[in-house]
Amino acid sequence: VHSAKIFTENVIGEVVSTEPNLITKKTDNNLDKSFKHICLGISASGPTKRWNINNYIRLAEEISKKIKCKFYIAGGKNDINLINKFKNSDVGKNCISFENLSIKETLPTLRGIDLYVGNDTGWAHISVALKVKALTVFCDSPIFSYGAYSKRMVTVEPEGVEKGKTTHDTLGKDKVSLNKVLSEALKLLN
């Protein structure tokens, strides 16, 4: 929690609590209310913490079959290959990438989304601070430290790992169930 708190504070230049409440300037984000807006946090601090991009594509395809939605791809210049793979997929036409925006520039959009689904990254923690529900995939980082501080954060862990017991050595990115993430995402969107 402490690392996520420091990261968020450094990015936004403000102090946040462990149940963060980030207040931003009110700006019109012009998000079409006839859609559900979902931020997909495909970025991660390392390959063992990153759920496979193909899972995000399949997740977006499945959600799109059930709900009219738009996707926002949270990643930066270091994630360009992943972003392009998503943009070139069948659901890519329904997405907007944050690749050329600073985190601060994404805040008006993030504030208006319905759900964050993604890896345990700064995007998840900023979303929670903006009072957005976050479905956070923990592949190889401790939920106890990074995912248990907010009622707005729902976590998914690798299959076979006891709830709340992921660590930095779990190495579970290939054991996170797409069906579990899909099921939780649909619950949070309804």
Which residue stretches match the model-derived regions?
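Catalytic machinery of carbohydrate-active enzymes
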Residues: 1-190
